[in-house]
UniProtKB/Swiss-Prot annotation:
Membrane topology of the entry: Multi-pass membrane protein
UniProt subcellular location: Membrane
Sugar-bearing residue positions: 171
Source organism of this protein record: Aspergillus versicolor
Name of the protein in question: Ava biosynthesis cluster protein G
One GO cellular component, as annotated: membrane
Taxonomic lineage: Eukaryota, Fungi, Dikarya, Ascomycota, Pezizomycotina
Coiled coil: none
Amino acid sequence: MAPANNPKGLGFQKWSAFWLWAIIGGYFAAFNIWNMRKLDFEGSFQVNSLPGEYAWMKRTAGFVSRASRMRFAWVPVQLLFMISTDFITSACSVIALLQFVPQLRKKYMSIHRMLGEAFFVMMGFGAPSGIMVAVHAFGAAENPSVRLSIMLTGVLTICFLATSFLCITTNGTLSRLRLKLHGASNPDAQDLQKYRAIDIRRHREFILRTLAVMSTGSFSSVYLIIPEVMNWTLGYVAFSCGTLVEDLGLGASYLRSAYPACMVENGGHAGTIVAVKADLSGSEEELTAWGRAGIGMAFWGALVLHMVLAEIYVSALTAVCLLLRYVGLILWLQIRVKSR
């Protein structure tokens, strides 16, 4: 029997993976916890949101407020979806950190599996809720590029996570399906044991891909700083006349001079689309346009960058593990030859 791999191993078998995710996941969790300040809808959310974002939330959710000695406000449904996603992803960050502890997987597999199932269930709720918000938030309803980037992030998260659990599920039907994908014509217990190491490796790879994509939304806010510092020109962004009037509160006289296509006498209506310049130091609608353009660009940049980095890490990890396996096999053969 050939010797096992290097006991210290690489990647998941070392604490380096734990500390790597401690940094990434720590920021990820901190960002989402900090984001929960939005629950103060008439306070923190209104002050820190983009122009028009507060008005959109208030208008689309049927916002109700009562002025009394203690101000009370019903939180919009869309905002609850957003906050629930923040809470779920924060909890998932902590669970993911625990899953990187080698001793937990080796000595307490039942706990590792239980935490993994909790991660799967929570992300099953968190990713769709994020997609639902993305359909409308950040101007996605008027800008397909923004909507596609955020929805693609959610869909990839769900697909990668589902694939990672397919690789290690003990369900009989799914296990037979997995073995058939390996090429086993009549799957049995021996086939299950034969492909076990491959399944575990693939499970780890898809979990890494899941975490890389899952953190896209939080890290896009970091990448958004780049065009701000570099003072990049982000072109023009599509706005509906209804958004300019209802969310940004632009008056008829301003529309007539700046966006004449919105005027009724020119055939304009609430659904008419106009191009608004994205300018960080411009007017209210230009600042909002800059935010929407920047968020769309940051989401695409974060998604592509995280996917590339994840694939590089997975490829390097696989290559080095194979190299160690070959080295171990050669050493074992040398020992066998010398012992004869």
